[in-house]
């Protein structure tokens, strides 16, 4: 009897630590077609696992309002979120935030040290500000500022390039202005470094 009771307690603990939404949810399945079965992301579709729920919510709102206007957003995300109600959006954000993220580790390791310096200190003489100031010392993000650590190199590189071209993430995002000061070498170094951050 004691052994059965212990097994039941273990099952209860494991169940309570899992994300609260079942993976069979239609809304979750719709997201994982592009973002991966474990929400760990692909080349152009970012990892959602472990992302800050406030950020996910803000981006759903930006897609719905067409404020996030890069090509992939227009082609896929504007229509993908059109039918989401506020409660489902919140549930999705909390579900994905609760999944343990895996690092991409796919950048150029020889550029990581340079990228770390740019991330922490910026390049003042080139008007490149520190990423640390907003995204935190370990690129973990805060509130609706996203977690960057461990995102895929090609996704990060592409987003930085798009911001530099004037595309937006939302009406209040400073990233187009910030990225406009980054050259190709700085972008490659930053994206490489961030892909290795735990």
Question: Where is each model-derived feature located?
Answer:
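Bacterial N-terminal signal peptides
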Residues: 7-17
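The canonical Cys-X-X-Cys-His
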Residues: 30-37, 92, 128-138, 190
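Axial heme c-ligation environment in periplasmic c-type cytochrome domains
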Residues: 42-49, 63-107, 142-147, 164-198
């Amino acid at each position: 009897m004691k052994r059965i009771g212990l097994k039941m307690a273990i099952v209860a603990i494991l169940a309570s630590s899992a994300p609260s939404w079942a993976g069979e949810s239609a809304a979750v399945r719709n997201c994982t077609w592009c973002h991966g079965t474990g929400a760990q992301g692909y080349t152009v579709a970012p990892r959602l696992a472990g992302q800050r729920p406030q950020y996910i919510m803000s981006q759903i709102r930006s897609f719905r309002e067409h404020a996030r206007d890069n090509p992939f957003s227009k082609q896929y995300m504007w229509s993908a979120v059109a039918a989401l109600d506020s409660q489902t959006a919140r549930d999705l954000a909390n579900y994905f935030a609760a999944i343990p993220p895996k690092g991409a580790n796919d950048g150029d390791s020889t550029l990581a040290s340079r990228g770390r310096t740019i991330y922490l200190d910026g390049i003042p003489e080139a008007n490149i500000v520190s990423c640390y100031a907003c995204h935190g010392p370990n690129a973990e993000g805060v509130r609706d500022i996203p977690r960057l650590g461990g995102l895929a190199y090609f996704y990060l590189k592409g987003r930085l390039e798009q911001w530099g071209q004037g595309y937006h993430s939302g009406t209040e995002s400073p990233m187009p202005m910030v990225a406009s000061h980054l050259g190709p070498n700085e972008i490659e170094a930053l994206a490489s470094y961030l892909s290795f951050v735990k």
